[in-house]
Amino acid sequence: MKKQGLYQFACYDELLKSRIKLITNRRCLLFTSIMILVFCMSTRAQTMKPNLKFGSPTTDELKMSSYPADANASAVTLCKITDVDYEVMSGDFKIVYDVRVKIKVLKSDGKDYANVEVPYINDLTDINARENVNGIKATAYNLENDKVVKTNMTKDMIFTERLDKQNMLLKFTVPQVKVGTVIEYKYRLESSLYYTINDWYAQNSIPTLYAEYHLVVPEYFKFSIEETGMSPLKKTMNMTPLSFFVGSDDLKCTGNDYDFIGTELPAVKDDDFVWYAKDYCSRIVAELRRIEIPGQLYHNYTADWTDIDKTLITDKEFGGRFHKSNPYKDKMTTAGIGKIDNTADKVAATYKILKENLRWDGKYRFWGQSMKDVLKAGTGSNADLNFVLLNMLEDVGVKAVPIVMRTRDAGRLPLTHPTLKCLNTFIVGAYVNDTTMVYIDSSVEDGFLNVLPSKLLVDRARIISKDYCSWVNLRNVASSKVSMFVDGKIDASGLISGTISGSYRDNAAAKFRSDYRQAKDSITYCNQKAEELGIDILKWQTSGVKEFSPVVANSISFTKKCESSPDHVYVNPLIAAPIKENPFSYVERNLPVEFPYPQMFNETVSLSIPEGYVVESINNGVKINTPDNSIMFKYVI
């Protein structure tokens, strides 16, 4: 007697646990399916009163061992105050950001908040696009034997790193931080980019007791000030007199004085099912519409994306890198790539030559180094390698273009008021015919055409071309498909023996290869899969795991022991189920569920029951759809 179970899984769903109960000669199959959704409302705990003074933490702050509003918090931002003002220097405006932060470390993981990073701009090609970070001070306060021990950060703990031709990163570490430490730090960022006000976030991955953003804008600068996020802030706006000294003249005007305050703000935690958690943090966004200085200047700053297109095409460090020589022309000629008729195959073969000669350094960038330096080092960012790939493809007659974007972990691109600052990387799009394009990025180690890392699968990316520029939704490009077939038999002792045949396509194949590559060796990988599936593997074979192709296949001969008694055998037919536990473990979830790409898992199971046994009972299976049909779970016996 055989029973077959069809398990179809589109995207992800709740955990399904099931057992089949077999009994000798007198009963039927018993199938139990348990799906539990628990929604709880958290009660609001009493929280402490914020201390807005810096330099002398209170006894309550020093002795604090947990945060009442979030008992699981590893740390809490006790106070974060940012003042943004305009000043005049050398006859021109600049923006000054004064930032002060106080954090309490509650658990070992919270010590990571002693490591601070401050991004800023220092454009090597434009002296008018420069920022400077100064006035950095940081202190750790610890309570030891009822005495406050104060440890100041020294200058040798401050570092700077150049990310590309525009962007810098300042990093520092607060010393002597441990569980119980109160961290304080402050810095000043001075920016010549007076027409751009940085976004301000009231929340982050730990709860915030108090956050304040104070912004004063002279009447000459017409900004649209927008508040976004899930936790509303208290806002006030007043007019205030301002005075600026320009040479020997005293320039008087009025200003818009904004104040935003947030209290007892919850943590916004990132996870595998949200693109970019900061998109849902409470934040203030300022978009410049125009500048009006009476009798001197009027400038409209309502730029659109066509302006960005033109800038990139004419920029010698971006558009100027196209139509260059192919450094691997001889190797591609030897490989016969130019003679390949199928364009997609030609793109794949070209990419293989690139990856055989250049190694990705693990960094995503927008601007590239010189090709000479990249070729000499044999390594580079995805941008470095993508510039080379564009020229390689052009050399074999494939039309290819850069597709610029902001990665998922940096947030979505703004719909209006764009700037180059919004962009942080690009991929390559290659036309295989007049209407179809394939996508690839040099960071891809284990995939194929149209298989991109999830951070690059954005819904708004822009094709940059002299012919035309347009938007493309890369979420529609990727997919993940897994098909499993289990054929086995159960003996009277409850031992299942059989084979599992699996096919992994597109992003699923890339993940298979990545897991395999990261394992110490094939034996280690095999042991990991055995533990993951709860089986003993007798024989294991794979195909396509080391190839540049869209599919990986494997075959496993296995045994698995089921729970049994003298006259019963309990069987879970989902031997290769993709989920072992509920990924949504939080009591309360305020963020949406966002999947990186469409996913499908299909498992078909055929099991023969032992001779002399019959099915005790069986249920009718289950089918669950979300209201928009974007997720479907189906179990049929």
Regions found by a protein language model. Give the residues of each.
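Bacterial N-terminal signal peptides
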Residues: 31-40
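C-terminal soluble interaction/assembly domains
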Residues: 371, 616-637
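Beta-strand-rich, non-transmembrane domain signature
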Residues: 46-307, 311, 369, 384-390, ...
